[in-house]
Amino acid sequence: MKVIASGVHIGVDDWLDLETLARACSVRVEYVRTLIDEGLLEPPPQAPALHFGGAELARVRRIRRLQHDFDANLQSVAVMLDLIDADLI
């Protein structure tokens, strides 16, 4: 079986709805909602309601990697992201 990877370019004016973001990150919609509820993910202010851009796509993927690589809960990931965002690590 031949595996072919594909991708989609997300432009500045392109938005992903909640379901598409979850699918692109290989997570459940409920997981993305949890990230929003916990304050780890926010839709950009200029985006339509519950729509996300490329930066948010990358953030969800980063959160999943941190959880997996460090076996971390969301509270620990929040601290890690604060340090990463502040360029302290």
Please provide the spans of the model-predicted regions:
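Arg/Lys-rich, alpha-helical DNA-contact motif
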Residues: 2-25, 29-33, 37-89
